[in-house]
Amino acid sequence: MSNIEHGLSFIDIMVFAIYVAIIIGVGLWVSRDKKGTQKSTEDYFLAGKSLPWWAVGASLIAANISAEQFIGMSGSGYSIGLAIASYEWMSAITLIIVGKYFLPIFIEKGIYTIPEFVEKRFNKKLKTILAVFWISLYIFVNLTSVLYLGGLALETILGIPLMYSILGLALFALVYSIYGGLSAVVWTDVIQVFFLVLGGFMTTYMAVSFIGGTDGWFAGVSKMVDAAPGHFEMILDQSNPQYMNLPGIAVLIGGLWVANLYYWGFNQYIIQRTLAAKSVSEAQKGIVFAAFLKLIVPFLVVLPGIAAYVITSDPQLMASLGDIAATNLPSAANADKAYPWLTQFLPVGVKGVVFAALAAAIVSSLASMLNSTATIFTMDIYKEYISPDSGDHKLVNVGRTAAVVALIIACLIAPMLGGIGQAFQYIQEYTGLVSPGILAVFLLGLFWKKTTSKGAIIGVVASIPFALFLKFMPLSMPFMDQMLYTLLFTMVVIAFTSLSTSINDDDPKGISVTSSMFVTDRSFNIAAYGIMIVLAVLYTLFW
């Protein structure tokens, strides 16, 4: 790191242009129709169910890591520290659970969408309720937040006005994904992950090395721990000002499980990749690969935020960066500027790679969300209620149109998110108002045969006012605890309502679960145990 002029050099622009050309080229190549055929709905929405494990795993991470992580989680690293990494490290365990216990049931049912599974297990009414919810969530929360945070990064790094940045990112994602569907998204995701890891590693290495000075990278880590010991605590106590965001041990045994199980197990734009795998075994291998990658993500996105905190707190380090150090300076109120601020000081060429990584994080997530929004609207709304007799060609075109409309709406709303502070925490908190109720429906629907459609509908509808009550009641409570209590409340409501209908009989649509469904091969088991051992070591080191 050094005193670098604001913006990108010609070399950086060329590096980024090469990245853009590769992504668009691969996307268009994969998108082409086979000679004499047109894309079917399975081709467009599930990549023809042909994905190998490594493509599934890479695409899961590319869909997951977005501006929400690079910008939002780095901002939380600046404000909170390594404790925010629990979202990533606990996700690794969650992925293993999803791969072993949830995925076999979904693939056995041969579904396109999560709402479709809801109809098979419950009824059309609940499916429609959840389909509308997910479409709204993807457009008004996920797409808008990724566009806003990505636009914020471009504005900080290049000085491009926020609205133009948002429109540029939207157009980029649309160009390579709209025609080819999930195939284009997944195969470009494989390339995106390479840039994500490389760019994230470069930023982390150079930021920490700058702190270490002539003593090197490891000395930089040691200096960071000495300068900000509170930023290297995984479990926060009640005296910590960030306890309400990450409430101590409850992170490991409470509400974070709600957020992770919902996100990785029942989130359309995540689970869609596993549904597109060649087989259950390939999907499970892909999930383990993604779990391994989750172990390293905090070192790519959280550590730079902590480094930015240490640098901005040290007058000598700030002075050595020159006058540009005061440009777009992060603070407690503007923590999300931490990562873009760091990129100002990267050497020529490296900045281009990091900028490509940031763009990869943003556009891969945008493309994933667009494809999933289109899939749910087309298969669960349009085909169900508007045109049941539509053929594959018509449905694929409807999906493309739905993606464009969703993106236009998100672009109009995204600039309104300005001034939300720690965007990552904001997104988790407001998604957490609805995720516990949905998780309760799926957990009981999958594993308790007495769960009825009436119980599920009443439970999920009742969960939202209960969650709002916990959020706005006079006695403050960490939002992770709110999620856990909302989950338990919803499960009680569902169970009570279901039993009041029929206390003895199973629901006719109940799923018969046998132990043979959850048998995994030796490689999956070895990898799963290895990941859990690594997690135990990490939490022991940073407890």
UniProtKB/Swiss-Prot annotation:
Descriptive protein name:
Sodium/glucose cotransporter
Which NCBIfam families does the record associate with it? sss (TIGR00813)
Does Ion transport count among this protein's keywords? Answer: yes
Per UniProt, what is one GO molecular function of this protein? Answer: D-glucose:sodium symporter activity
Disulfide bridge map: none
**Family matches, as InterPro entries:** Na/Glc_symporter_sf (IPR038377), Na/solute_symporter (IPR001734), Na/solute_symporter_CS (IPR018212)
**Matches recorded under PANTHER family:** SODIUM_GLUCOSE COTRANSPORTER 4, SOLUTE CARRIER FAMILY 5
Family membership: Belongs to the sodium:solute symporter (SSF) (TC 2.A.21) family.
Origin organism lineage: Bacteria, Pseudomonadati, Pseudomonadota, Gammaproteobacteria, Vibrionales
Membrane topology value: Multi-pass membrane protein
Where, per UniProt, does this protein localize?
Answer: Cell membrane
* Record's keyword terms, sorted: Cell membrane, Ion transport, Membrane, Sodium, Sodium transport, Sugar transport, Symport, Transmembrane, Transmembrane helix, Transport
Role noted for this protein: Actively transports glucose into cells by Na(+) cotransport.
Spell out the Pfam families in the cross-references: SSF
Q: Where are the transmembrane segments?
A: 10-30, 45-65, 79-99, 129-149, 156-176, 193-213, 246-266, 287-307, 345-365, 401-421, 427-447, 455-475, 483-503, 523-543
Q: What is its main location?
A: membrane
Give Gene Ontology CC terms.
Answer: plasma membrane
Statement: the UniProt record of this protein carries the keyword Cell cycle: no
